[in-house]
From Swiss-Prot:
One of its GO terms (cellular component) is cytoplasm. The active site is at Y129. Its EC number is 3.1.15.-. It is found in: Cytoplasm. SMART domains: EXOIII. InterPro entries: Exonuclease_RNaseT/DNA_pol3, Oligoribonuclease, RNaseH-like_sf, RNaseH_sf. It is an enzyme of class 3 (hydrolase). GO terms for molecular function: 3'-5'-RNA exonuclease activity; nucleic acid binding. Keywords: Cytoplasm, Exonuclease, Hydrolase, Nuclease. This is Oligoribonuclease. The gene is orn. GO terms for biological process: DNA metabolic process.
Length: 181
């Protein structure tokens, strides 16, 4: 498949916390859709190795959720560091989307961008500076059409691939219920 500038890159990171100055990325997943939000490619889903010290520093919420999902054990067992995760992800993305054209797509991608900027700059640079943040649409729908909110329920698995799939489904839902384009 030739890279297409109209394709969209969807990303989700799982982190040890919310502060890039002290927390680290522990999982990354990407999907590519066409402009109609049809999934056309799934990138590698990568648990990124972090030290036991980094994992032990996670707060209770992260320990609970990443422990229950099995992510902590996957991170401990992983041999992939951040640089290798970046290389694998860019190799996948380059098949579908030229560098610098796709906005960063997902939920609360501003937070993901902060971590990419800190730890995975080459991957952050692969994106356009714009974001396609489903969270923004959700906030608008909540205020302007609250009855529409009841029609979409997220599973909140806090697993990167499932979270991206839900983000795409959520935007598809809002597109069908709210946007008259």
């Amino acid at each position: 498949m030739a890279a297409d500038a109209n394709n969209l890159i969807w990303i989700d990171l799982e982190m040890t916390g919310l502060e890039p100055d002290v927390d680290r990325v522990i999982e990354i997943a990407t999907l590519v859709t066409d402009q109609e939000l049809n999934i056309i490619g799934q990138g590698p889903v990568i648990a990124i190795h972090q030290s036991d010290e980094v994992l032990a520093a996670m707060d209770d919420w992260n320990q609970k959720h990443h422990g229950e999902s099995g992510l902590i054990e996957r991170v401990r067992a992983s041999q992939v560091n951040e640089a290798e995760a970046v290389a694998q992800t860019i190799a996948f993305l380059a098949q579908y989307v030229p560098k610098g054209v796709s906005p960063m797509c997902g939920n609360s991608v501003g937070q993901d961008r902060r971590f990419l900027n800190r730890y995975m700059r080459e991957l952050e640079d692969y994106f356009h500076y714009r974001n396609l943040d489903v969270s923004t649409v959700k906030e608008l729908v909540k205020r302007w059409s609250p009855e529409t909110m009841a029609g979409f329920k997220k599973q909140n698995t806090h697993q990167a691939l499932q979270d991206i799939q839900e983000s795409i489904a959520e935007l598809q839902y809002y597109r069908s219920k709210v946007f008259k384009i």
